[in-house]
């Protein structure tokens, strides 16, 4: 089989989620193919759906959607791409710490029922015999080197804890990719520099407020689980030992800021007053959004 050259990719994949991306008919079509039916067009304007569509477009263009392909999802939850891929490749393995931690409560992504009844979460009919679900820690992937044609993780690695844990998870993902195979990591990136993103300053605020503000900040980790570009390079990209298939485009269009959503406690306050587009969010410092990173292991 001749593998497509990554230099000839038809679009910029390694980039931030940007409002004009949703104006692309191919992205919209892929989005609608992957997510559950029934969303109004304006409800599709969300960064999670962008992540799904970009994954589908990249795997389609790179020739990875094959009957003999084996795919591993890290911190998979019960997201739609698992079921979509089960209908298109030979084997999908979904892994997560199902039933453990904050993402396992109230029907959230790591609900324990995924281990025994993944069909409960399926957005449409899928080939159940093509999807396996395992409880597994992303820091210790229980597969030999070079096991999977595709490994992917969507907006999860930023939640793995201290930088050392994040680096180990990135290295583990790359380790189990077959030569010539693909690694996709989507994570969350701070789009501007802001003094409040400096962890020691957040700790000072936490101390002065007696823990009422920025209560999870530490000297080594800010409150918001998102990366500055240099942290992304250091803690996610470099530990894979792989080169991204393209340079990363960190630019955003002005229209992406039109509905900046500010997170205040448990409330989300969109600038326009409308829930969508749900693309760019702001907590304590810089705004942040999703970043798509695709890598290929040398054959």
Language-model region placement:
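Conserved class I S-adenosyl-L-methionine
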Residues: 182-230
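A short acidic, Gly/Pro-enriched loop at the edge of an enzyme's catalytic core
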Residues: 136-151
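A short glycine-rich, Lys/Arg-flanked "PGG" loop and its adjoining helix->strand segment in the class I
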Residues: 167-182
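Nucleotide donor/acceptor-binding cores
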Residues: 66-70
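Class I SAM-dependent methyltransferase SAM/SAH-binding core
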Residues: 72-73, 79-140
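A short SAM/SAH-binding and catalytic strip from SAM-dependent methyltransferases
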Residues: 149-164
């Amino acid at each position: 089989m001749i593998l497509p050259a990554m230099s000839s990719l038809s679009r910029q994949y390694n980039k931030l989620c940007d409002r004009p991306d949703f104006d692309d008919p191919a992205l919209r079509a892929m989005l609608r193919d992957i997510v559950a039916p029934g969303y109004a067009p304006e409800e599709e304007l969300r960064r999670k759906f962008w992540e799904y569509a970009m994954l589908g477009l990249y795997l389609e263009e790179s020739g990875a959607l094959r009957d003999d392909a084996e795919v591993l999802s890290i911190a998979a939850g019960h997201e739609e791409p698992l079921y979509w891929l089960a209908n298109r490749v030979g084997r999908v393995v979904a892994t997560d710490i199902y039933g453990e931690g904050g993402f396992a409560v109230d029907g959230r992504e790591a609900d324990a029922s995924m281990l025994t009844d993944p069909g409960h979460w399926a957005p449409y009919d899928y080939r159940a015999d093509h999807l396996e679900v395992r409880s597994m820690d992303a820091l210790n992937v229980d597969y030999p080197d070079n096991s999977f044609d595709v490994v992917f993780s969507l907006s999860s690695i930023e939640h793995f804890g201290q930088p050392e844990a994040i680096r180990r998870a990135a290295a583990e993902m790359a380790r189990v990719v077959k030569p010539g195979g693909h690694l996709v990591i989507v994570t969350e990136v701070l789009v501007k520099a802001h003094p409040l993103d400096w962890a020691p300053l957040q700790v000072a605020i936490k101390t002065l407020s007696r823990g009422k503000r920025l209560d999870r900040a530490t000297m080594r980790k800010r409150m918001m689980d998102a990366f500055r570009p240099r942290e992304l390079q250091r803690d996610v990209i470099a530990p894979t030992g792989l080169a991204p298939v393209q340079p990363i485009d960190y630019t955003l269009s002005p229209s992406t800021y039109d509905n900046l959503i500010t997170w205040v406690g448990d409330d989300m306050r969109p600038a326009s007053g409308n829930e969508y587009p749900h693309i760019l969010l702001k907590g304590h410092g810089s705004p942040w959004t999703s970043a798509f990173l695709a890598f290929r292991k040398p054959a």
